[in-house]
């Protein structure tokens, strides 16, 4: 009897640089490539139509490429734990290959399948190819803890063995005598389903801005490397109006689904740099997008609560407001701030927004204006973003909300000034918010300030055709900076933490706070006269600090107060490469100095202002 093998695709939807599939084929007489449509997809069933379409296009492209090898993709619906015992028997399987999944829910799922395979006498092949490095080795090198500063992470990877080269693409020569049994009714049994078959209404669905699949990914990679201006200098391009639109060289969704190998991208960048720079060694900053991705993967791999505030050992427990109405306005692009609303509209329509646009809307939702938990924003991104990745998405939201990977909280993106500096003419606003198309550039970012005559000429009356701003940004950001400052001051009382290394006496002053990001940010200007704190241009490489608080409790005023649980674990990761952690035994302590009494701002609004009144909190 021959050796029958199965390769299970999850991420890694490609034939290039697929070491698990390549090893599976070696010594096998038959191989079947399967994809299981299951509730574990992306760690959540909260997936929008654009993401489902991208996935199905990836599967169709994979099936087309397998056909060139006289093979096919077998798409099977169900739970892996139910599907595999049946397949092992029905197909008489001897070995199963998978790409290593570093995320906690993926590791749990794979452990269960390995157990079933062992019981069935099936050999399991697991190979790392979704990340550049073996994340467990990074953690081991750091004394068993994930590095929580980007600088520390860079130090660790510089000590590791050089990366392995990508493995050869699966070709007919690689397949040799290994065949795939395909029945006449394959498409009926195992074909890639349509969106309609999955229950989606596709009436009026515009064509995809980002076509899915390995073929498109490799084409984009070549375009990416050919960009003349970028290749010449290897510098981050400056932010401008065109940066906000989907680029034909964009790669993030393809890296997320594994249509493009991160190792192939890494080595293509390396080769190009050496060719242009005459064999000089490339700096780590060349690989910024890939290394930030790796950094968040490492931070998340052993933390199943990484996407939660409660129970997450690296997340500050901040008493965010619960405000479903305000959350819905933000998610649906109805905040009354054209810059924020245009970004959220683009996200919902196309499934992608520029990483600095992500920062702007994340800041607005959390510490900037609405004081709503980063978890809520993360869920919206998880639904709508094509490149939403469990580790990177959660890590990025924690960072920008100042809940972890500490950023200077007194920097705040202005929902008027930031957009105006990026796209002074407002073309981006007109593209995604056609209701505002008639406004002149002077008023398109703050149309509520336009005289009535201009609003009438634009055929858009603010408060009728387009909403009034839901908050007064200058007041809301000032109040929220103060709230965050007091939370961190409370933490800093436990000396040795040094969490407020640089809290300015003037929180509206300039500074060089790093920009949170999956991809280091371009040089930008922040808010000035339009209200809110100024944002210094940064490269995304600032020292990252993190700490964990204990439980919250409610004080006598009815306002949730921040406290420490008995024997709470507070972690501190010091500046630079020297990383230390301290276990502090602290009694229950409420937040010390309270926030000045007063209402949340309520400027020119038709609805109630966001959040409850903030009452003075007493010292315990």
Curated annotation (Swiss-Prot):
Protein name according to UniProt: Cryptochrome-1
Motif LIR 3 positions after renumbering to this chain: 151-156
Keyword set includes Glycoprotein: no
Induction: Up-regulated by light. Higher levels in light/dark cycle than in total darkness.
Motif residue range(s): LIR 13: 492-497
Domain of life: Eukaryota
Gene Ontology CC, one term: photoreceptor disc membrane
Motif (LIR 2): 82-87
Family: Belongs to the DNA photolyase class-1 family.
Organism lineage string: Eukaryota, Metazoa, Chordata, Craniata, Vertebrata
Cofactor: FAD; (6R)-5,10-methylene-5,6,7,8-tetrahydrofolate
Source organism: Sylvia borin
Residues binding FAD: 252, 289, 355, 387-389
Primary location group: cytoplasm
Function, as annotated: Transcriptional repressor which forms a core component of the circadian clock. The circadian clock, an internal time-keeping system, regulates various physiological processes through the generation of approximately 24 hour circadian rhythms in gene expression, which are translated into rhythms in metabolism and behavior. It is derived from the Latin roots 'circa' (about) and 'diem' (day) and acts as an important regulator of a wide array of physiological functions including metabolism, sleep, body temperature, blood pressure, endocrine, immune, cardiovascular, and renal function.
């Amino acid at each position: 009897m021959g050796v029958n093998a199965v390769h299970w695709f999850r991420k890694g939807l490609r034939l290039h640089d697929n070491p698990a599939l390549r090893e599976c084929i070696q010594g096998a007489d038959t191989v079947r490539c399967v994809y299981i449509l299951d509730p574990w997809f992306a760690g959540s069933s909260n997936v929008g139509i654009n993401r489902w379409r991208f996935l199905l296009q990836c599967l169709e492209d994979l099936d087309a490429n397998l056909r060139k090898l006289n093979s096919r993709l077998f798409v099977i619906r169900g739970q892996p734990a139910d599907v595999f015992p049946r397949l092992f028997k029905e197909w008489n399987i001897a070995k199963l290959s998978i790409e290593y999944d570093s995320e906690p829910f993926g590791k749990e799922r794979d452990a269960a399948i390995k157990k079933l395979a062992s019981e069935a006498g099936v050999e399991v092949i697991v190979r790392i190819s979704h990340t550049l490095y073996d994340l467990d080795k990074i953690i081991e090198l750091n004394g068993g803890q994930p590095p929580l500063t980007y600088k520390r992470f860079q130090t660790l990877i510089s000590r590791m063995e050089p990366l392995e080269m990508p493995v050869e693409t699966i070709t007919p020569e690689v397949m040799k005598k290994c065949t795939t049994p395909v029945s006449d009714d394959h498409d009926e049994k195992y074909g890639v389903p349509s969106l309609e078959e999955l229950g989606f209404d596709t009436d009026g669905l515009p064509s995809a801005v980002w076509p899915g699949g390995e073929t498109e990914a490799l084409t984009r990679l070549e375009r990416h490397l050919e960009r003349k201006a970028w290749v010449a200098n290897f510098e981050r391009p400056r932010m401008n109006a065109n940066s906000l639109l989907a680029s034909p060289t964009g790669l993030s969704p393809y890296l997320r689904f594994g249509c493009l190998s991160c190792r192939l991208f890494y080595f293509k960048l390396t080769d190009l740099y050496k060719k242009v720079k005459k064999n000089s060694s490339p700096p780590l900053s060349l690989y910024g997008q890939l290394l930030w991705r790796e950094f968040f993967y490492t931070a998340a791999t052993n933390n199943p609560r990484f996407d939660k505030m409660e129970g997450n050992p690296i997340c500050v427990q901040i008493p965010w407001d619960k405000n479903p109405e305000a959350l819905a306005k933000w998610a649906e692009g109805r905040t009354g701030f054209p810059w924020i609303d245009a970004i959220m509209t683009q996200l919902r329509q196309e499934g992608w927004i520029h990483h600095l646009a992500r920062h702007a809307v994340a800041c607005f939702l959390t510490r900037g204006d609405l004081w709503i938990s980063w978890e809520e924003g993360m869920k919206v991104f998880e639904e709508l973003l094509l490149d939403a990745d469990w580790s990177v998405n959660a890590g990025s939201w924690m960072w920008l909300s100042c809940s972890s990977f500490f950023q200077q909280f007194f920097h705040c993106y202005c929902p008027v000034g930031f957009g105006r500096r990026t796209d002074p003419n407002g073309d981006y606003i007109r593209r995604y918010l056609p209701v505002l198309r008639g406004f002149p550039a002077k008023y398109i970012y703050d149309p509520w300030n336009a005289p009535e005559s201009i609003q009438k000429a634009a055929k858009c009356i603010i408060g009728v055709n387009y909403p009034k701003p839901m908050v007064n940004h200058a007041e809301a950001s000032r109040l929220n900076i103060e709230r965050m400052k007091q939370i961190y001051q409370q933490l800093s009382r436990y000396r040795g933490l040094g969490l407020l290394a640089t809290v300015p006496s003037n929180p509206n002053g300039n500074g060089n706070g790093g920009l949170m990001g999956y991809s280091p940010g371009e040089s930008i200007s922040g808010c000035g006269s339009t209200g809110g704190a100024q944002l210094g241009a940064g490269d995304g490489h600032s020292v990252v600090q993190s700490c964990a608080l204990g439980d919250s409790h409610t004080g006598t005023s009815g306002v949730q107060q921040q406290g420490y649980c008995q024997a709470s674990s507070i972690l501190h990761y010091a500046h630079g490469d020297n990383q230390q952690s301290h276990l502090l035994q602290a009694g229950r302590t409420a937040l010390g100095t309270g926030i000045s009494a007063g209402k949340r701002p309520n400027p020119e609004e038709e609805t109630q202002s966001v959040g409850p009144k903030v009452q003075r909190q007493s010292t315990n």
